[in-house]
């Protein structure tokens, strides 16, 4: 399992002085990027093969939010592949050595020329090795959005600071956007994120919030009501 050590920075905190949900997502993303770079299959190499990995789904279970200044270890390990999909585990350990965060993710390998999924080959996955999936609840990568009962929020336009090197809204930014529509007293213990399409600079995002029996669902939609991203929050 690949890992790197870090320390929770002030710039990564939520208002409660703990590592924010989008800060957690950013650490997980950074961890898989660092592993790929160290194995010699980083972004430039994969792009040179006219391929790219895109994130489809997160399942993130939060036992404890790390504190300001806490030394943490972020770890990741591939846990399988099938057709055009790759599967990956993540863990964030606190100073006590216990797992504060556990996560499972699903990725799709794309052909960068055709911008269509392509089959995962040995050169795409073998370097990582394969571990067993974490013992998390097995859930669908598709998040169902209710047909009614949603509360529309004020629409906004995608800005440059929302974007990453792929020129679309970064995965962590969607989580940050969606979290803004939760009640201040709500504590996220699990979040699931389904990425459906790419929002670009200048696109309009229309958030719709739904109250659920165990939390909330936020659909970040385009002007026609099609979701870019759906985030399910459970307390």
Model-assigned labels for residue ranges:
Residues 50-65, 187-189, 193-198:
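Small beta-barrel nucleic-acid-binding modules, principally OB-folds
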Residues 2-4, 57-62, 67-143, 199-201, ...:
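HotDog/MaoC-like acyl-thioester-processing domains
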Residues 150-232:
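Acidic/His-leaning functional-site neighborhoods
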Residues 1-55, 102-104, 111-186:
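Hot-dog-fold acyl-thioester-processing enzymes
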């Amino acid at each position: 399992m690949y890992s790197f050590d870090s320390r929770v920075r002030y710039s990564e905190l939520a208002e409660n002085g703990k590592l924010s949900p989008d800060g957690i997502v950013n650490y997980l993303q950074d961890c898989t990027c660092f592993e790929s770079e160290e194995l010699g299959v980083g972004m430039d190499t994969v792009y040179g093969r006219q391929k790219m990995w895109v994130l489809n789904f997160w399942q993130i279970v939060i036992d404890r939010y790390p504190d300001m200044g806490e030394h943490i270890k972020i770890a990741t390990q591939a846990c399988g592949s099938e057709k055009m999909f790759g599967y990956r585990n993540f863990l964030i350990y606190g100073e006590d050595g216990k797992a504060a965060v556990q996560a499972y993710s699903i990725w799709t390998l794309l052909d960068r020329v055709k911008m269509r999924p392509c089959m995962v080959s040995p050169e795409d996955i073998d370097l990582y090795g394969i571990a067993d999936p974490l013992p998390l609840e097995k859930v669908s990568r598709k998040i169902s959005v209710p047909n009614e009962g949603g509360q529309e929020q004020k629409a906004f336009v995608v800005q440059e600071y929302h974007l990453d090197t792929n020129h679309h809204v970064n995965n962590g930014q969607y989580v940050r956007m969606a979290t803004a529509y939760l009640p201040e007293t709500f504590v996220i213990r699990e979040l699931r994120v389904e990425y459906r399409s790419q929002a670009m600079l200048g696109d309009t995002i229309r958030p719709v919030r739904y109250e659920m029996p165990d939390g909330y669902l936020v659909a970040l939609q385009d002007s026609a009501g099609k979701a870019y991203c759906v985030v399910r929050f459970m307390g």
